[in-house]
Structures are given as C-alpha cells and as structure tokens.
Amino acid sequence: GVTNKRPELDGEIRTTIDQTAWTDEVFSMKRGKMELVASGTHSLLSADGTPLWLVQKGKFAYRILPEYTREAFVTCETRPTDWVKRNKVNEKKQGLPSEARILRLWANHGQRPVDDTYGYVVYAGRQIPSDELPFRVLQNDTLVQAVCSMDGKVVEAVLYPGNKGLQAEGLSLSASAPCAVLIREEAGEIVVSVTDACMNAALKGIRIVLNGREIKVPMPQRMF
C-alpha cells in the first residue's frame, strides 16, 4: 500500500531492505553461480527478470519477490562521514574515520506510486540459498500477509485490522481480532499459536476459525 501523497515533489519513494556496513565481498547469485558485485548501483533483477540472491560474505542473503516488487537495487559505496552532525559530542573526539563503506539494498516505487507493493526474502543459513524457495506466498497486502511451506505443514499469517480473513487453496482462516498466527503439523496433530498483534491488555481471547473449525485461544492476563 505504498502511496506518495505529495507526488509533485522531486524524488522517488524507496523502501529500505537493508543498510549496513560494507565489510567484505558482496556477491549476487543465480542458479548456484556466484558473481562478485562491484562498487556502484546494480539491479537485484537479472536481465531476463529473474531475481538474484544478494549476499555479503558471512552475512545474510536477500532476494526480492518479483511478483510484488517492480524494481530493487543494491549499492556498494564509500561515503564521507560527518560525526559532528550526528552528535555534537563528537567535536572533541579524535581518530574517527573520515569515510564509511556502506551496503544498501532498497525497493524503488518511483515518484508517483499508488498502493504499490514490495516483498523480499531473508536467508540466514550458511549454505548457498536455492533458487527454489521453500515456501509460497498466499497473500501479501495491507490486510493479510501469509506464507505456507511447500509441504503444507507450516502456515504463518499476520491478520491486520479490517481484514476479511484468508482464503487460499485448501485453507480458510479468520480471527476475531488482529493477530499473528502460526499453524504447524506435528506428529499428525495441528498446533496453533496466536499472538495479539495490537498488544491489547483488555483482550481476553482470540477466536480462530481454521477450515471451519473454531479454536478459542485465551490471551495472557495481568502480565504487565
């Protein structure tokens, strides 16, 4: 739901995926092949529109979901620092670095987005991530965000205020209040975990309806 309410102003609307220290080599990956990313700005989509994994050596890997993200970029850059601008206390400090190496990733929505979307994946493992994701996105908008593992044994969903529930292939889910829901199959049983997304201290419980079955989940009371 990204919308620019002042489109007459210069500049583009961006969503930051990550902004961190550029401390080591940065690689893009496609079909298991790694390619060193040079300084400058580069697209996170290959020439044929296929999304690339982007990883800094020893760090997290990122990949956009092209069905939700039209444009995304990475920049490896070195910029001058201004420590006094950050904090006046730094006026008396000596030996602060004069420049910083920065790695930035962002989704670009352009100058006049209206209800634009974005989506990306973060991989925290040590192996080379696969081009085939281990999950599928069921819904990704301002009312419901939900994913399901490829084997169907794990479903994660966030139901925002005003949502009408989730309807997907083989799955129907609704809740009596905004919440985050984790559904997983364990030893032939279905385990449901629910978190009150609004942290409403007066909320006694949340009623979940999963594929027509009602599940009442009490919320913790007097914890704070």
Model-found features: residue ranges?
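C-terminal beta-strand-rich structural cap/linker in extracellular carbohydrate-active enzymes
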Residues: 61, 116-121, 221-224
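Extracellular structured ligand-interaction cores
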Residues: 1, 10-14, 49-50, 59, ...
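Beta-strand-rich recognition/accessory modules
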Residues: 67-154, 160-161
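Non-catalytic terminal regions with compositionally biased, polar/charged low complexity
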Residues: 123-224
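Acidic (Asp/Glu-rich), glycine- and aromatic
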Residues: 3-35, 207
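A structural signal for short secondary-structure junctions
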Residues: 5-9, 97-99, 111-115, 185-187, ...
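Short, glycine-/Ser/Thr-/acidic-enriched flexible segments
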Residues: 4-7, 20-22, 59-61, 69, ...
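Trp/Gly-enriched beta-strand surface patches
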Residues: 33-106, 165-173, 199-203, 216
